[in-house]
């Protein structure tokens, strides 16, 4: 019931802000010459992997490579910050940006300066707000409720700022998250209970973020679906079986080998594919 009340509260706030946004003027047509893809986010947007750190093999890089094939004038502006939360995206404190105090401020400044030349904006944010709620091996529901409230409030402000700065010219896209804590299934009955509970939390987070993204006109990359997050169908695994969602987490992330939540190169390719399904390479 507590989570439901949070969702209702967020809904009222979102609709109120959306009414304000409808008064924004439409961005001018993209001029000839250089165009831009602006990518915001946390470590996923930086292609982080535990053995190499930030990389050029993440989903952002793979999306850009695909778009660049048909749009050689397109340049990538990669603003993501490993460890970023919705709060630090707004206020700063982790990564530095020349002339800007936060990732959001840097994005807003770039969008304003290059209004009409930005073709794509993607974002992933929120996982670092809520992942600590399972740090002890159990899910702290009070932490979850507080984190969801923070995410809802901050994401609203982030999206208001991005749309006000970028206008209606770019294609905007956000993503749902996969659930790395499904890997706990391999630890036995207690881990399996944690895994099932974590899916409920992931669904609540994804539902909240998807609702806010759609209110502000963002396309949704269904990463949760691509990782089969809700599919507990048993499939072969080693000498036995596990649910498909568990096998997928083991195959596409480092959770079952290095106990690290980040995707491997294959996992980043799956995330990129989810974005590519909703982001068009056609000219605006």
Can you say where each PLM-predicted feature lies in the sequence?
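Serine-esterase "nucleophile elbow" of acetyl-processing enzymes
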Residues: 28-84
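Acidic/histidine-rich helix-loop elements
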Residues: 48-57, 83-99, 139-142, 146
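Short, low-complexity, Pro/Ser/Thr/Gly-rich segments in the mature regions of secreted, periplasmic
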Residues: 274-284
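A structural preference for short, hydrophobic beta-strand core positions in alpha/beta folds
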Residues: 13, 17, 78, 174, ...
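Alpha-helical cap/lid subdomain in secreted, periplasmic
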Residues: 98-261, 265, 269, 276
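Secretory targeting and sorting signals
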Residues: 2-29
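Substrate-binding cleft and catalytic face of glycoside hydrolase catalytic domains
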Residues: 77-87, 123-129
């Amino acid at each position: 019931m507590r989570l439901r009340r949070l969702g209702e509260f967020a809904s009222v706030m979102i609709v109120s802000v959306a009414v304000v946004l409808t008064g924004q003027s439409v961005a001018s047509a993209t001029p000839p010459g250089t165009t831009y893809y602006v990518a915001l986010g946390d470590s996923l947007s930086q292609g982080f992997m535990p053995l190499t750190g930030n990389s050029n093999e993440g989903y952002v890089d793979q999306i850009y490579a695909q778009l660049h094939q048909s749009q050689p004038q397109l340049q990538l502006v990669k603003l993501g910050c490993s460890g970023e939360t919705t709060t630090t995206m707004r206020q700063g404190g982790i990564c530095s940006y020349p002339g800007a105090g936060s990732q959001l401020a840097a994005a807003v400044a770039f969008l304003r300066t290059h209004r009409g030349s930005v073709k794509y904006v993607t974002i992933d944010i929120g996982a670092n707000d809520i992942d600590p709620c399972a740090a002890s091996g159990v899910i702290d529901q009070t932490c979850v409720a507080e984190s969801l409230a923070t995410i809802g409030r901050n994401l609203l402000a982030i999206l208001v700022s991005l749309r006000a700065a970028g206008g209606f010219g770019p294609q905007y896209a956000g993503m749902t998250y996969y659930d790395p804590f499904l890997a706990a299934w391999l630890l036995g009955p207690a881990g399996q209970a944690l895994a099932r509970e974590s899916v409920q939390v992931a669904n609540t987070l994804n539902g909240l973020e998807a609702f806010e993204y759609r209110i502000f006109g963002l396309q949704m990359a269904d990463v949760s679906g691509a990782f089969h997050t809700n599919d507990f169908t048993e499939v072969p695994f080693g000498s036995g079986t596990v649910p498909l969602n568990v096998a997928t987490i083991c195959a596409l992330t480092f959770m079952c080998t290095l106990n690290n939540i980040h995707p491997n190169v294959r996992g980043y390719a799956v995330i990129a594919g989810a974005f590519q399904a909703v982001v068009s390479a056609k000219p605006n």
